[in-house]
Regions:
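Short, Asp-centered acidic motifs that coordinate Mg2+ and/or phosphate
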Residues: 271, 303, 331
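A glycine-rich (often HGG/GG-containing) alpha/beta subdomain
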Residues: 1-147, 151, 155, 331
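C-terminal-of-GTPase-core extension/linker across diverse P-loop GTPases
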Residues: 2-9, 13, 143-265, 282-284, ...
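Inter-motif core of Ras-like GTPase G domains
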Residues: 287-311
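Switch I (G2) and immediately adjacent beta-strands of P-loop GTPase domains
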Residues: 54-65, 70-74, 255-282, 300
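Generic enzyme active-site microenvironment
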Residues: 273, 307, 333
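Short glycine-/small-residue-rich Rossmann-like dinucleotide-binding loops
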Residues: 242, 277-278, 302, 309, ...
Length: 459
């Protein structure tokens, strides 16, 4: 338990019905009792833990500050696993600021960003994946991302990782036995068995990595660029997806001169959608800037939607844009299907893949549902929905998993080549440490500090 007692407002600042001040640490009860007086006249600590108590907060001069409810949560049955007092007051900014200031006067210090959750981690109530899931819950963009974050907060990923670590620890124990007692005939240790154990763990890691793409999209949104030459219906497509007239639509080419960026949920998939200026050669200075932005967005996007005018044949401008997008994850939208098709769909599908070329009318909305279905398959895979397995939450976890797999691959190769057992053990131990860094079992202090510094004050 940390020695210092900390406090912070844990609800959003601003006008609201209720605001909450949290006090956590060894002296949380003493701090709370200095400013809160129960209407019954009893001390807060005299009530059973986790009992909501009605009363008032008073200033140092005895004047009334607010009518409140207070609750004392005794360690370890609290968010931080420390003694915690929470005071629920009216949600006005001045009331919250005054009560918080009184906690400082009573001996608490301001909590740092993420310090409550950091203490929950350091006190062993949650692991690092669960701590990261707390912020994912707060920042959820969709029902699917909330469901995934809640699942991770319950420790699903950590359980799988600890299962892998346990299996690898068994490998190390057996290897050490052979190294220390070479004269013994230990049946559990053969090069073939080591290879099999390592291979099983690699398969499990590959399964987790296969979901990393989905987890990242649900957490951060899929950065998507709508590109094409002028007047193919990019802005009309944006408006159709948004179901509102967000972008100006005109029969004149070059109407969109800047990037229009919007966030939307399309069948539960969070998109960060950018409608770009039409890509073409132009002498117009302002339009030229927009075209350059479009080219850059095409390169930076995680998904490119290439729009072509299906009522006309492909031009050299279309071909140049399609070539630029061919090295990116992309889908080809053959727009204006309501006007008849002059584009060779078979040739496009042979070039880009049958499932990546689809017809659509941004005017009549025909084909929009097909695009939504394609997008769900792109994000979730063939299942088309969130599976029951564990998901990697962020780039840190993905990087460590890939490094752990690389170490295990090297261990497997060493076993296949019948290298000394201690060489194999080094690689397996490294994988164990890397997996432990994901859950926080082996992580360094500076990494912990960096992770929790990204949290908001009061969490």
């Amino acid at each position: 338990m940390a020695e210092e007692t900390i406090s912070a407002v844990i609800t959003a600042l601003g006008e609201g019905a209720v605001g909450i001040v949290r006090i956590s640490g060894e002296h949380a009860l003493a701090v709370g009792e200095r400013l809160f007086k129960a209407a019954s006249g009893k001390a807060l600590g005299a009530y059973p833990a986790n009992t909501m108590v009605y009363g008032h907060v008073y200033d140092l001069d005895g004047s009334l500050v607010d009518e409140v409810l207070a609750v004392f949560m005794r360690s370890p049955r609290s968010y931080t696993a420390e003694d915690v007092v929470e005071i629920q007051c009216h949600g006005g900014l001045q009331s919250l600021k005054k009560i918080l200031a009184l906690t400082y006067a009573a001996g608490a210090r301001p909590a740092e960003a993420g310090e409550f959750t950091k203490r929950a981690f350091l006190n062993g109530r949650i692991d690092l994946t669960q701590a990261e899931a707390v912020m994912d819950i707060i920042r959820s963009r969709s029902e699917a991302s909330l469901k995934l974050a809640a699942r991770q907060q319950q420790g699903q990923l950590a359980r799988e990782l600890r299962g892998l670590r346990s299996a690898l620890v068994d490998v190390v124990v057996n290897l050490e036995a052979v190294i220390d007692y070479p004269e013994e005939d230990i049946e559990d240790v053969t090069y073939a068995r080591v290879q099999q154990s390592v291979s099983d763990c690699c398969i499990a890691i590959d399964k987790l990595l296969a979901h990393a793409h989905t987890g990242k999209i649900l957490r951060e949104g899929l950065r998507t660029a709508i590109v094409g030459k002028p007047n193919v219906g990019k802005s009309s497509l944006l408006n159709a997806l948004l179901k509102e007239d967000r972008a100006i639509v005109s029969q004149y080419a070059g109407t969109t001169r800047d990037v229009i960026e919007e966030q939307l949920l399309l069948d539960g998939v969070p998109l960060v959608l950018a409608d770009t200026a039409g890509i073409r050669s132009t002498d117009d200075f302002v339009e030229k800037i927009g075209v350059e932005k479009s080219r850059q967005l095409l390169q930076d996007a995680e998904l490119v939607i290439c729009v072509v005018d299906g009522s006309k044949g492909l031009t050299t401008e279309d071909e140049a844009i399609l070539a630029a997008a061919s090295g990116k994850p992309c889908v080809i939208i053959v727009n204006k299907s309501d006007l008849g098709l002059a584009v060779d769909l078979d040739a496009l599908r042979e070039r880009f893949g049958k499932d990546k070329v689809m017809t659509l009318s941004a005017k009549t909305l025909t084909g929009v549902e097909d695009f939504s279905a394609w997008l769900k398959n792109y994000v979730y895979g063939s299942e088309g929905t969130l599976s029951d397995g564990a998901y990697v939450q962020n780039a840190r976890q993905e990087r460590l998993l890939r490094e752990a797999r690389q170490s295990l691959q090297e261990a497997g190769e060493a076993a296949a080549n019948m290298l000394p057992y201690d060489c194999i053990e080094i690689d397996v131990r490294n994988a164990i440490d890397l997996l432990g860094e994901i859950t926080g079992d082996t992580v360094q202090d500076e990494i912990i500090n960096e992770i929790f510094s990204r949290f908001c004050i009061g969490k």
